[in-house]
Amino acid sequence: MKKIIASLLLLISSASVYATDDPVSFVKKLPYKQVVKDIVLSRCLAQVADDKSQFSLDAARSSNALLEWVPFDIENGNDKINALINKYKGATNAFHSERKPEVQGVTLNCLRLYYSDELNKLAPQLIIGNPDRTWIQDNPQ
């Protein structure tokens, strides 16, 4: 009997560990407007990387996965995001001291976009509802 009880307790404690191990819990805690900014950064990195690279594919899929946790205006949002990315991704960064012709500084362009006033203004507009809320606030358990 003691073995059965011990086994049940072990099973229950193991199940609770896996139940609380949510790999996207960090995303669910972020304000929607922050997740949109992260979507834009991921998408920008996907677009500036070699389109056949594993990194580009991973960044694109990460961007798409983040959309699962945001009430995103899909009809207007994608075009607005892509237009803003296109504005930033082609900038030339000639000021870098180690710049070689094949080095364009595209990661820097994506970071510049991420911290831009334009993205700070756009991100809340792409949310259906309150951009300061989080997924957890809107989906209590």
Locations of the language-model features?
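N-terminal signal peptide c-region/cleavage motif recognized by signal peptidases
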Residues: 13-16
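N-terminal secretory signal peptides
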Residues: 20-66
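Compact alpha-helical subdomains of small soluble proteins
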Residues: 59-141
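Residue-level signal for mature regions of secreted extracellular proteins and peptides
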Residues: 7, 35-37, 103
